[in-house]
Amino acid sequence: MKIELQKWSFEDKETLITICNSIDRSYLAGRIPNPYTEESADWWLNMVGESDGKNAVFRKIVADGKIVGNISVEQKEDVYCKNSEIGYFLLPERCSKGIITEAVKKICEIAFQELDVIRIRGRVYEPNIASRKVLEKNDFSLEGVLRNAVFKNGEIYNLCMYGKLAGDRANG
């Protein structure tokens, strides 16, 4: 399977809406509107256009020519300005196929080249074993667990904090 990361464009809006209304939100933060509307997509695509390459890298994940998800690395501010955070989501039917593992490898390379950062962090709800494995396969280190740190849908979760430094071994 050929995995590519490509820049988002307004021509992708309908696909973005479809994906965002199809994803499993069990372990996602609440920042992605639900339902995901045309207005949501317009706002987000404008923000991506303004931020990409400056303080963030946003890419659509393309598997065998089809857009199947999103991945991003966003630079932090103030005293955390050399840090960034990775986030991703994928169509449910494309999970467990190695797509996200490859996409994380690629986005980390891009982020360390394009952004003025030395560190990428990943925050994962403790029961999200698949996402934890994705980060670990890409040389992210488990740096700690924040106990009872997340409250979502009436449940309390521990939050696993992962980190990858620019000098950490490349996956592969």
Question: What name fits each language-model region?
Answer:
Residues 22-25, 34, 50, 167:
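Residue-level marker of structural boundaries
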Residues 1-15, 19-22, 61-172:
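Acyl-donor (CoA/ACP) binding surface of acyl/acetyltransferases
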Residues 25-46:
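Conserved GNAT-fold acetyl-CoA-binding loop/helix
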